Amino acid sequence: QTKRKLNEMKELMLLLLVWIGNNSTLEVERVFLPEVKLVSSAELHERFGIEETCDGIKIKALYNRDNKIIYLHEDWNEYNLLDRSFLLHELIHHRQKESEYACRQEMEEEAYELQFKYLKENAINNPKEALNINDVFYIILTTCAAVE
């Protein structure tokens, strides 16, 4: 079942890469698909470096730039729009590694804004609310720290 899910995910990733190419300046031609692993909530939180019991933060997906692997929560469902948007977000990070950014937060801002656009195009009027992201958390995630 998991192997079938991962094979079907490849088709979805190709469709999402086309969407990324049509909605951003990120390079999507001649792109290899990253490996995808379905992992437990505990492993996602460990890879992110926070306690699984940390209130309000539920990690659903991560991209590791070093090994080029997308990690998705083991209950990821290709038919769930929010889950597809998590995969889209991590595919954006996969493509961002080829570009220059001032800071990691700038990459997050681009990924979130594209994810929000994708959700709006699919009838989610308030993507931040659907993703359980409040304005303060969004600012923290997407604002580069001042460098002196």
Can you name each region flagged by the protein language model?
Residues T2, H73-N77, K97-A102:
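Second-shell loop/turn segments in exported
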Residues Y71-L87:
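Short pre-active-site segment immediately N-terminal to the catalytic Zn-binding motif
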Residues T53-D55, R104, T143-A145:
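Sequence contexts marking disulfide-bonded cysteines in secreted/extracellular proteins
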Residues C103-I140:
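Post-HExxH zinc-binding segment in Zn-dependent metallohydrolases
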Residues G56-K58, N80-S85, E106:
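Short, surface-exposed coil-to-beta transition loops
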Residues S85-E98:
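Active-site recognition of the HExxH zinc-binding catalytic motif
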Residues K5-Y71, I124, L131:
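Auxiliary, metal-adjacent structural segments of Zn-dependent hydrolase domains
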